[in-house]
Amino acid sequence: PKFPEFNADKQIVLEDEKIKELIKKTIFACSTDEARPLFTGILVELQDGKITFVGTNTHRLSIKTMEQESSEAMSMIIPSRVLSEIARNLTSELPQEVKLSLLNNQIMVQIDKVVIVSRLIEGKFPDYRRVIPPAFNIKTLFNVKELAGAVERVALFSSDGDYSIIKVSVGNNE
């Protein structure tokens, strides 16, 4: 069957590597709880020559920003399932363009000969900028391998829940 006409109001063209990176760095933080549909998607913002993907389930928050030329500012919430499908279809070794076209409350994604049409998630995404403090009182440096090893050891004692919390105490000159 042929797709219906989709005369887009707005359109964004992204390089495949860029959108893969944006998806990879944010999708894990999305909720899977359909009772709160707003958090099952990724907030996509275009403004000031940058594109930002934001994912949260209210316990985790992930933000990834990259340079992106855009003629106008826009904001939308794309379902995480659509973004997973985009990532799954970006398998070619050759560079590909991903075209996102918006019309009312729908998005059409074109990757080579693949076309995905979906509804956007309606609602107002929480202001994630207010969650992050403008300045931090404590700064610390650590060895990533040592921290990863410590987290793996502590994880053995944590429950299998989604939100295992590790408390880190930092003393003076430690």
Language-model features, listed with the residues they occupy:
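Structural preference for solvent-exposed beta-strand-turn elements
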Residues: 1-174
